[in-house]
Structure formats: structure tokens, C-alpha cells
């Protein structure tokens, strides 16, 4: 088992920017029982190679995957293997025409980006879709997910992207992810930290534990010090 599996990770995403990465993905699949998601940016052909390498899901970024025909090629490939797609919207890489229309990255623009690609999927009678609407701005991320959840019932992958180093990123992720999960929104989560990925898994479990949705590890109840304290705690 990998270090991430030992930490409790249940699904892992790897980027596939080139053929070497696709070949590495094949080796990764042979060494883990976890589902492996292939993260695709710009070059849609890498999605086709990732499927051949054994990816369990393909993530595309609507802001940089390119024209409709590219998405259709990916759809044809995943349909042949009965694989899902994650439409992974990112506030930092929205389509230029949406930025022009809305002025700047808004929740409405993010949802519209997802809707465009949902429409392409539906044209091809493909409905095995997961959606994410990530932003590094926590209130924007929360607003985007809420807006989408009001309109659709697709599974949602939650995350505050580019959340930052351990302390800052943990707090931003706890607020963003925790708020939505407490409202019944979200199906999978990723804590994004500029740190060891194992720490991302640990923080993710702490968020779930705080909402009584996970029991992994001990929950420490500790005195913060108050007027009842009779000894020098520190």
C-alpha cells in the first residue's frame, strides 16, 4: 500500500501532461487499489492515452481543454470504457468569453462554464459526470457550489484550490469544504495544500471528523485554559 493509502486516501488524482506521464500512470495503476483520476489540461489527446493506461476517471478543465470537438473525442473514448468525467471548473482559468461577459470570475460565470460542458455531454447521451467549481477565494467557491447545487443533482467534488501553505490552506479548506458539507452539498473532497499530500489527507479527515462524518484517529478534547484552571498548564 502507498503512503497515501496508509493515511486514508480513497481516491488520487495525477496529472497527465505528456506520454511519459501516461506511461507512469499505467505503473501507478498496477501498484494501487485506489481509483486514479487523470488530470488533463490543454492537450486532449493525453486524455485518450490516460484511458488506455487504465485511468478510472478523466478530469478536464473547461477553461483550457479547447474546442467542442476535443471534448467529443474524450467522450467517445470514456464511453467505450464506461468511465466518468469530472468537469473541473477553476475560477483562475475561465473561458475568455465568460470573463468578458461577467467582468471577472463570478459564481455565475463558473456555473455557466460547467453548464456548457454538461450540454456537450448530454448531446452525446453521456451523464456519468462529476462537477467541481474551485476557487482560491473561499466565499466565491462556496457561492459557486451553492448556485450549482440549486440547479443540478450531479455529484460534486469540493475543494478550495491554491489554498496555500499548511496553516492558511487548512483554515480556508475547513471553512469552504466544511460549510458546504454541513449544508448537504458535496460528495468527495480534496484539501489543497502547498505541503506533503499526506497532510492534505489528514486535514481532510479532520474536517469530516468535525462534522461527525468520519471516525479515523482520536479526537482530542483539550483545555484552552480558563478561570477554573488551578495549575500552570504551560
Give the ranges of each region predicted by the language model.
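Conserved radical SAM core fold
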Residues: 46, 64-65, 91-99
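N-terminal active-site wall of soluble small-molecule enzyme domains
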Residues: 1-3, 12-53, 234
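Generic structural signal for hydrophobic
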Residues: 3-6, 28, 50, 74-78, ...
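Catalytic alpha/beta core domains of metabolic enzymes, predominantly
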Residues: 90, 98-234
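Hydrophobic or amphipathic alpha-helical targeting/insertion segments
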Residues: 34, 45-86
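Catalytic beta/alpha-barrel core
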Residues: 11-18, 35-42, 56-66, 110, ...
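Alpha-helix-loop-beta-strand connector modules within alpha/beta enzyme cores
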Residues: 18-40, 73-85, 145-156
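Glycine-enriched alpha-helix->loop->beta-strand junction motifs that scaffold or abut catalytic
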Residues: 8, 32-34, 52-58, 79-82, ...
Amino acid at each position: 500500500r502507498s503512503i497515501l493509502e496508509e493515511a486514508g486516501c480513497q481516491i488520487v488524482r495525477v496529472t497527465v501532461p505528456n506520454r511519459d506521464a501516461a506511461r507512469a500512470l499505467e505503473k501507478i495503476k498496477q501498484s494501487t487499489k485506489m481509483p486514479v483520476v487523470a488530470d488533463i489540461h490543454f492537450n486532449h489527446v493525453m486524455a485518450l492515452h490516460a484511458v488506455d493506461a487504465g485511468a478510472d476517471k478523466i478530469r478536464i478543465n473547461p477553461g483550457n481543454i479547447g474546442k467542442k470537438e476535443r471534448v467529443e473525442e474524450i467522450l467517445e473514448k470514456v464511453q467505450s470504457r464506461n468511465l466518468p468525467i469530472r468537469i473541473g471548473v477553476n475560477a483562475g482559468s475561465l473561458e475568455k468569453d465568460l470573463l468578458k461577459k461577467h467582468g471577472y470570475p463570478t459564481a455565475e460565470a463558473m456555473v455557466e462554464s460547467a453548464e456548457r460542458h454538461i450540454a456537450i455531454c448530454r448531446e452525446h447521451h453521456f451523464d456519468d459526470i462529476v462537477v467541481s467549481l474551485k476557487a482560491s477565494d473561499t466565499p466565491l467557491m462556496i457561492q459557486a457550489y451553492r448556485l450549482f447545487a440549486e440547479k443540478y443533482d450531479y455529484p460534486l467534488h469540493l475543494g478550495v484550490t491554491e489554498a496555500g501553505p499548511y496553516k492558511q490552506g487548512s483554515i480556508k479548506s475547513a471553512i469552504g469544504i466544511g460549510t458546504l458539507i454541513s449544508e448537504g452539498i458535496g460528495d468527495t473532497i480534496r484539501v489543497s495544500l502547498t505541503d506533503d499530500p499526506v497532510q492534505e489527507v489528514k486535514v481532510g479527515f479532520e474536517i469530516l471528523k468535525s462534522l461527525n462524518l468520519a471516525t479515523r484517529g482520536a479526537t482530542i478534547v483539550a483545555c484552552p485554559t480558563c478561570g477554573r484552571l488551578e495549575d500552570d498548564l504551560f
